C-alpha cells in the first residue's frame, strides 16, 4: 500500500495515509522523463487501486461506459462511484473501500430493506442504505461514523442520518464530487490503445 501511494499519490479509497511531501519530488527526479504510456498507465493504476478493482473488473466497466451515451470517462467514474462499497466509504460508514467491501461481504448492509452481499452492486437514486438490526453490525458502523471527520464534506448525491445508521442516495453523482484527483480521459485512452 505504501509503495502504491508513494508512486501514485493519495488514494483515499485504499488507505487514509498520505505520501510524504518530499517523496513526490524524489519520484520525479528518479524517473526522469515519463513517457506518455507511463502517464496513462499510472492514471489507470490510480483508478484501479483507489476503487480496489482487478484489471478485468476495470476493463468491464470501461466497456460498459464506452457503450453508453455521453463522455466515456465521466460515465466510467459515475459507474465506479455508484458501487455499494464506494457509497459506504463516501457516507463515512467505512474508513476505506476494502473495509466497506468487508462489511458488505459479511452481510451487515441492507439496501432498501434487503441484505446485499455484493460489493459491486450498483446503487440507484432513492436507494436507502442501512445496517442490519444486530448490535454487532451497528457497533461496527458506529465506530466509523463517529470518527468520520467532516459530515459537511459529504458529496451532494448522498445524505446520512448518523443516529439511525442510514444513508440515502439522492441522485447519480456529479463529476465535481468525485473523491479522487484523476484524469479519466487518460484511462480511456490507455484502454483504447490496448485494443
UniProtKB/Swiss-Prot annotation:
Keyword vocabulary terms for this entry: Chloroplast, Plastid, Ribonucleoprotein, Ribosomal protein, RNA-binding, rRNA-binding
Keyword rRNA-binding carried by entry: yes
Location, primary (coarse class): plastid
Domain of life: Eukaryota
Pfam families reported for this sequence: Ribosomal_S4 (PF00163), S4 (PF01479)
Any Gene Ontology CC annotation: small ribosomal subunit
GO biological process assignments: ribosomal small subunit biogenesis; translation
Keyword hit for Transferase: no
Assembly, per entry: Part of the 30S ribosomal subunit. Contacts protein S5. The interaction surface between S4 and S5 is involved in control of translational fidelity.
Name assigned to this protein: Small ribosomal subunit protein uS4c
Amino acid at each position: 500500500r505504501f509503495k502504491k501511494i508513494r508512486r501514485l499519490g493519495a488514494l483515499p479509497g485504499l488507505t487514509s495515509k498520505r505520501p510524504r511531501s518530499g517523496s513526490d519530488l524524489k519520484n520525479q527526479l528518479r524517473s526522469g522523463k515519463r513517457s506518455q504510456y507511463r502517464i496513462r498507465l499510472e492514471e489507470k493504476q490510480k483508478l484501479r487501486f483507489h476503487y480496489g478493482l482487478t484489471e478485468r473488473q476495470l476493463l468491464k466497466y470501461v466497456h460498459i461506459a464506452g457503450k453508453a451515451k455521453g463522455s466515456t470517462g465521466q460515465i466510467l467514474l459515475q459507474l465506479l462511484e455508484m458501487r455499494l462499497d464506494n457509497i459506504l466509504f463516501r457516507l463515512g460508514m467505512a474508513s476505506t473501500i476494502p473495509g466497506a467491501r468487508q462489511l458488505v461481504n459479511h452481510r451487515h448492509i441492507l439496501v432498501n430493506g434487503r441484505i446485499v452481499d455484493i460489493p459491486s452492486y450498483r446503487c440507484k437514486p432513492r436507494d436507502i442504505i442501512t445496517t442490519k438490526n444486530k448490535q454487532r453490525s451497528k457497533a461496527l458502523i458506529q465506530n466509523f461514523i463517529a470518527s468520520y471527520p467532516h459530515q459537511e464534506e459529504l458529496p451532494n448525491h448522498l445524505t446520512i442520518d448518523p443516529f439511525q445508521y442510514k444513508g440515502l442516495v439522492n441522485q447519480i453523482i456529479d463529476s465535481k464530487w468525485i473523491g479522487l484527483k484523476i484524469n479519466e480521459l487518460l484511462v480511456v485512452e490507455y484502454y483504447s490503445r490496448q485494443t
